[in-house]
Swiss-Prot record:
Cited InterPro entries: Ribosomal_eL37/eL43, Ribosomal_eL43, Ribosomal_protein_eL43, Ribosomal_zn-bd
Keywords: Metal-binding, Ribonucleoprotein, Ribosomal protein, RNA-binding, rRNA-binding, Zinc, Zinc-finger
Single GO term (MF): structural constituent of ribosome
Family to which the UniProt record says this protein belongs: Belongs to the eukaryotic ribosomal protein eL43 family. Putative zinc-binding subfamily.
Cofactor comment text: Binds 1 zinc ion per subunit.
Gene Ontology biological-process annotations: translation
Protein name, as recorded: Large ribosomal subunit protein eL43
Its biological purpose: Binds to the 23S rRNA.
Gene field: rpl37ae
Domain of life: Archaea
Amino acid sequence: MANQSSTGSAGRFGARYGRVSRRRVSDIEGTMNEDHACPDCGSEAVSREGTGIWQCGKCGYKYAGGAYQPQTPSGKTVTRSIRTALGETGDSNSE
């Protein structure tokens, strides 16, 4: 008898929708259900409330993020750019 592997969250689709689509759904839902750090208190208690809405279970901090991740890669890039711009502006004002 062949070894059985766990199908993950996409096992509910059975043989439908193709292998690649089911794997993508499984990967997305896996990262969505992981523990995420709260940007306010730092605890690993952030959970998804709805599409793009995330809330910390410890401090109750609610914020908007990505649909499947609390912070998207493009959001990280924008935050880094803003910090860099504010850092350069702050240094030039202090001189």
